[in-house]
Amino acid sequence: MYNIFIAPILNGHQFVFTMCLWYVVPLFMIEVLNILIRKILKLKIENVNEYVFFIVSLLSGMLGTYLASKGYNKGWYLFLDRILYFIPFFSLGILYNKKLEKSDKLNNTIYFTIIFLIQLLIITINGKPVTCTPSWCNFNGNVIMPFIVGTLGIAFWLRIAQILEPIVRNSRVVNIISENTFSIMVHQFLGFFAVNTIFAICSKFVPAISNFNWHRYKTDIWYYYLPNDIKQWYIIYLIAGIIVPLIISYILEKLKDKITNNLIQNNKLFNKRLDKENVV
């Protein structure tokens, strides 16, 4: 019961194959809080100023990184810190959608130059790249630095997506992947494990891979077997980490459709019987 109801809130890593779901509970809480806060504000303010809302959210996030830096990132504190850390990015997304997107017209060269120069300046001042581990709320730098580097990363990939969108928008493969990103994120480790399982079976019959580590296979989710330690084999894990989740998503969609159709059919039959009884 603890692993089902409490562990997802406190850490989200209780089931290693789906540990990528750790962020779902904090994100859900943020969406609920966002709606509640805006509902309350609208009782007093007709139009919420998104810039002010973002600044307040950023201050909340800085409180979260401060608490985490002081060691308050375990148990229920971790749950709180995750929420506080995510709030500024959630608010920034709303701010961008409502206010900033229409002004996002800067030339690509200037745009990327600004991002790279700011990032280079941060690395120079810090002495190394600033790293963050949001899942455990381990942050490098001062209380605002995680939000600066996070925003730079978002800005970079946002523009990359804008550049690629006209090129790949009609790609069937890209569309399939884009429509199943949640499944890929959730089930990627099952794909990796599937490759390891194939290697495990083959190691019984193929002498060349007899050095497969069965102990790590059974106990270490991060174990990836590379024949002759050739790093290019990682591409097989990458492909499996996409294909296996797509297969799972396809099966689940088919099951969902079948169950839905059965429920609809049963409901129609029930209504027909009810109509007959009413007539009688």
Stretches with model-predicted labels:
Residues 1-280:
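Alpha-helical transmembrane segments and their immediate juxtamembrane cytosolic regions
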